[in-house]
Amino acid sequence: MTARYIAIDWGSTNLRAWLYQGDHCLDSRQSEAGVTRLNGKSPAAVLAEVTTDWREENTPVVMAGMVGSNVGWKVAPYLSVPARFSSIGEQLTSVGDNILIIPGLCVSHDDNHNVMRGEETQLIGARTLAPSSLYVMPGTHCKWVQADSQQINDFRTVMSGELHHLLLNHSLIGAGLPPQENAADAFAAGLERGLNAPAVLPQLFEVRASHVLGTLPREQVSEFLSGLLIGAEVASMRDYVAHQHAITLVAGTSLTARYQQAFQAMGCDVTAVAGDTAFQAGIRSIAHAVAN
């Protein structure tokens, strides 16, 4: 009989769970009980609630994300990069009876200190779905990952997503703005500025000045700022992209479209994989191996 197992993406603010029989998803559930929102409950109690009537005898549970961080259930030690893809699923941390956490990855060099949790599971899936030498994983903190067919060799992090949120919501740039609207032209204009002048710090106040002076519609500041930051990010990582024969984007639909536009402007072809699809493929491969 094909093995039954539970796969969980447990982040800071949300928890998503899937019940599988082999490669077939039998059920899925979602909770707002991220590791920073447990409301006094233990992680074990939350897991028991979410997986009620799912676990039969010793059904394996494999978890990824911030659940393995120092604010989660238990620290799942980072694996140092370079790291073989196969080693990720071989060094799981146990927190209970057949309940396991996938390790994160880290880099610690004189010129590069970085960590990731959750993205390593997406990488395992993306490697199967769209093999590449460079994986770009947009989000709050965009990961740029160099890899070959066997191992992850290096990665960097660019905080464009968080910077956009902070500037728009907690700085003078976004103060007093009306509700923002989608505006492809404003995004494209910001993208061009960022690609052509990636030293973005001197340009940030100009975003405010532009809407104060009326040259940028106040409802389109978010779109222009998004383009500016993504353009600057992609341009500043130009050396990381150089000589890469294949680039895979791993993200949701909206961010994929924005980064595709940036790469196309640089003359780079990319393949896109949905972030959720990559994550589920990655965690299934690990959980399936554990269950069998």
Named regions from a protein language model:
Residues 5-9, 60-62, 133-137, 248:
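Short glycine-aspartate micro-motif
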Residues 5-42, 273:
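Short glycine-rich, Thr/Ser-proximal phosphate-binding strand/loop in the N-terminal lobe
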Residues 14, 244-262:
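Glycine-rich phosphate-binding loops at beta-strand->alpha-helix junctions
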Residues 24-60, 68-75, 175-176:
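N-terminal phosphate-binding loop and adjacent alpha-helix
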Residues 38, 106-193, 197:
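Glycine-rich phosphate-binding loop plus the immediately following alpha-helix
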Residues 54-113, 149:
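Short beta-strand-loop/turn "lid" adjacent to the catalytic site in phosphate-handling enzymes
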Residues 193-234:
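Adenine-nucleotide phosphate-binding core of ATP-dependent small-molecule kinases
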Residues 235, 268-292:
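Glycine-rich phosphate-binding/hydrolytic loop that grips phosphoryl groups
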